[in-house]
Design a protein with these regions (language model features):
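Thiamine diphosphate
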Residues: 1-148
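Conserved beta-strand positions
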Residues: 27, 163-165
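Conserved small/polar residues in nucleotide/adenosyl-binding loops
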Residues: 168-170
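Conserved anion/nucleotide-ligand pocket segment
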Residues: 144, 151-163
Length: 170
């Protein structure tokens, strides 16, 4: 029987990224996305595999650092809350044109009904605008499976993938 764990959505995404061969995670702290990077930082697999974990100065910087890692052929994850997509918009939209070498997954933790933030925003429109595919899991298991698929898809298509999380962190 397979090992089973009870995880929040953010934790499922972090564990799926680690199991997908993550090389680095870049983020700007902000609920509801902070827990993803914290989980990776504290997981023994990240230390064992020397996964680079960095809190960036802002979301645009995090996006650019993750792009740099991807350009080098490594799998990178960038995490931000929904309003962080506004800050990272320039780098995110242009990444649809510059592409990615290693898998690049951009996580936007949207917050419908303002459960843990100051406003509502639907980040799917950024994906549509930038011609970047958007994956939106609805359960923790889907989140774990989908992030692994997202890295593979990004590498095969040579473009980033946007994963929209909406209240899956609860």
């Amino acid at each position: 029987m397979a090992n089973r764990e009870l995880l929040l959505g953010d934790e499922a995404l972090a564990l799926g990224a680690l199991h997908a061969g993550l090389s680095g995670v870049y983020a700007y702290p902000g609920t509801p996305s902070t827990e993803i990077t914290e989980y990776i930082q504290n997981h023994p697999l990240a230390a064992e595999r020397n996964v680079h974990c960095k809190w960036s100065a802002n979301e645009k910087t995090a996006m650019e650092e993750a792009l740099g890692m991807s350009f080098c052929g490594k799998r990178a994850l960038v995490c931000m809350k929904h309003v962080g997509m506004n800050v990272a918009a320039d780098a995110f939209v242009n990444s649809g044109m510059t592409g990615a070498n290693g898998g690049l997954v951009v996580v936007a933790a949207d917050d419908p009904s303002m459960h843990s933030s100051q406003n509502e925003q639907d980040s799917r429109f950024y994906g549509k605008f930038a011609f970047i595919p958007v994956f939106e899991p609805s359960t923790q298991q889907e989140t774990y499976d989908m992030v692994r698929y997202a890295f593979d898809y990004s590498e095969r298509s040579h473009i980033p993938v946007l994963m929209r999380l909406s209240l899956i962190h609860i």
